[in-house]
């Protein structure tokens, strides 16, 4: 079975669903840390203005309450990749694929199924804080490595920021997907191409219930198709010809 790892996003689209949160012990440790910080502290950590820091301070205080605004993670995050993922009006098969095969790598929650209910927050692995005297990457490493202890095929749609949370040994198990545009023989890629293509690729995998690498290689999405010459056992490259 294939499991697909995707990153979080800074941009969020919040819905008002109030419920009692279920939080892991590690998540609670991070919340306890941030809930003690002042607005001034958050300005420095996030490098944001006072108004934005006040908003973040309130969010961390809200985590300490018994009820929170919760959203399915796949619908809360709303960056470019997420906006190119089919997230609404899913068929039964598509919903099952989303629940069982798509996982979000979070600096607050760990690795979670895409439909997990979570709350709005600002935190990534580049945030310069220490939790139990460790960076966030080190703090989560054992949890992330444990996720890799299965026979599933691990497909990474992650940036380097998220992949380096895994130990080097576990990182070697990841299958990376690359997305390139061919413009008159010139191969080009940049973050916008990659983010859009990741979302389109994930949608195609979900719609086709893709469970093997061979099936993945056969997919066509948004003009992209698999290029064997530019690929190897750990790097699958998809090319889109532009005229």
Swiss-Prot record:
Single GO cellular component term: cytosol
TM stretches of this protein: none
GO biological-process terms attached to the record: response to hydroperoxide
Domain of life: Bacteria
One Pfam short name: H2O2_YaaD
Family: Belongs to the UPF0246 family.
Name under which the protein is recorded: UPF0246 protein gbs2036
Organism the protein comes from: Streptococcus agalactiae serotype III (strain NEM316)
């Amino acid at each position: 079975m294939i499991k697909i790892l995707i990153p979080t996003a800074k941009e969020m689209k919040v819905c008002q669903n109030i419920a009692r949160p279920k939080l892991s012990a590690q998540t609670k440790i991070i919340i306890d840390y941030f809930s003690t910080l002042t607005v001034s502290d958050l300005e420095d950590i996030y490098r944001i203005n006072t108004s934005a820091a006040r908003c973040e301070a309130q969010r961390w205080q809200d985590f300490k309450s018994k009820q929170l605004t919760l959203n399915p993670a796949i619908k809360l995050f709303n960056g470019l990749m997420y906006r190119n993922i089919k997230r609404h009006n899913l068929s039964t098969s598509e919903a099952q694929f989303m629940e069982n095969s798509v996982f979000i790598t979070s600096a607050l929650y760990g690795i979670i199924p895409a439909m997990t209910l979570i709350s709005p927050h600002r935190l990534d692995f580049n945030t310069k804080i220490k939790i139990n005297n460790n960076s966030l990457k080190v703090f989560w490493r054992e949890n992330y490595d444990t996720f890799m202890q299965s026979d599933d095929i691990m497909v990474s749609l992650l940036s380097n920021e998220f992949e380096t949370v895994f130990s080097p040994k576990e990182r070697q198990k990841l299958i990376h997907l690359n997305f390139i545009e061919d413009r008159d023989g010139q191969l080009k890629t940049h973050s916008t191409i990659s983010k859009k293509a990741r979302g389109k690729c994930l949608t195609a995998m979900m719609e086709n219930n893709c469970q093997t690498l061979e099936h993945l290689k056969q997919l066509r999405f948004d003009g992209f198709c698999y290029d064997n010459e530019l690929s190897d056992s750990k790097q699958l490259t998809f090319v889109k010809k532009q005229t």
